[in-house]
Amino acid sequence: MKILSLRLKNFRNYKEAEVSLSPDMNYIFGENAQGKTNLLEALYVLSLGRSFRTTHLTEAIFFGSSHFFLEMTFEKDGFCHTLSTYVDKQGKKILCDHSPIKTLSQLIGMVPIVLFSSKDRSLISGAPADRRLFLNLLLSQCDPQYKHTLSYYHRALLQRNTLLKTKQTSTLSVWDEQLATLGAYLTVSRYFCCEQLNQLVQELWSNSLSEQLRIKFKSSLIKQGNLSQEAIIEELRKQLTTALHRDLELGTTSVGPHREDFTLMINDLSVAQFSSEGQKHSLLAILRLAECLYIKNIYNACPLFCMDDIHAGLDNHRISQLLDLAPTLGQTLMTSTNIPHQSLSETSKIFSVNQAQISIHSHLIVN
């Protein structure tokens, strides 16, 4: 899977722009606030139907305009496709090859993407919801059953919470059963996803890219290492029954997969408590690389890998090691305020961005 071109109209600081991408490394440099990150955001919006910078896509509309339009052409399984997103105050329209995409479930996974940015700090110091989102986006891009199960789970959870708020308990058991059945699949999927990521992290760590990192998955539903869905279904049933009185008082469901979390550990110590800022940034880069390899193992093809403001937290040695891995990661976009000092392949492209003007840069150090 390769992105061939990207077109932007009335998006952020871009009135109109179009860029053709290298199938390998795309290095984008320029001063701050010129539009580098906006290019990555555009690809993210096209791929996932959401932004990593705002919950309201209308905030990305060019000042004074009524809408924005994004379009990418991409090659997948030997065929070329066009994917577009139109956003105005009335809503969002997504088309693939001119056919409407009506739900995000249809969109997610069509163009797998992984983003490494400063916002990844939330995976260390943010709320549990930030870490669940990481797992949900990864698994939804790789497993159609997971994304559908997650959607049904959230619907059932909403129904149960509505009944709790209005103290209507007569049909709670119906929703409890749905939550237990759907929730067990989510929990088991998340557990094994973390275990596979841990294996990939160790492979990357063996290349001496960073310290030893481990994801410690935390769920109250897994008892004594029993990972059978039947056991987890029964455990969630039990917890929902036990917590009913408290849930009625709170008007919300206090147990289940929507309360799960994970902790990043370095050499069996909490990254949040015992790592320097530089270590944290390097370890998060490792985690995102592992995410790329996870998706690659599922699809036998690399996702689009985007790295924003790469010099903000990594030194030149770490960046060189990332670039050495780039050929195994497929198509990559990397933004920075600096011209690259590391060697790139002949098929790489270097772009400079200045006041939303994108230019091909002639500076290229070839391996």
From Swiss-Prot:
Matches recorded under InterPro entries: DNA-binding_RecF, DNA-binding_RecF_CS, P-loop_NTPase, RecF/RecN/SMC_N, RecF_2
Main location: cytoplasm
Swiss-Prot/TrEMBL GO biological process terms: DNA replication; DNA synthesis involved in DNA repair; double-strand break repair; SOS response
Cellular compartments per GO CC: cytoplasm
Source domain of life: Bacteria
Keywords assigned: ATP-binding, Cytoplasm, DNA damage, DNA repair, DNA replication, DNA-binding, Nucleotide-binding, SOS response
Chain positions recorded as ATP binding sites: G30, E31, N32, A33, Q34, G35, K36, T37
Keyword DNA repair found: yes
Location(s) in or outside the cell: Cytoplasm
MF (Gene Ontology): ATP binding; single-stranded DNA binding
UniProt similarity note: Belongs to the RecF family.
Function noted in UniProt: The RecF protein is involved in DNA metabolism; it is required for DNA replication and normal SOS inducibility. RecF binds preferentially to single-stranded, linear DNA. It also seems to bind ATP.
Name of the protein in its database record: DNA replication and repair protein RecF
Organism of provenance: Chlamydia caviae (strain ATCC VR-813 / DSM 19441 / 03DC25 / GPIC)
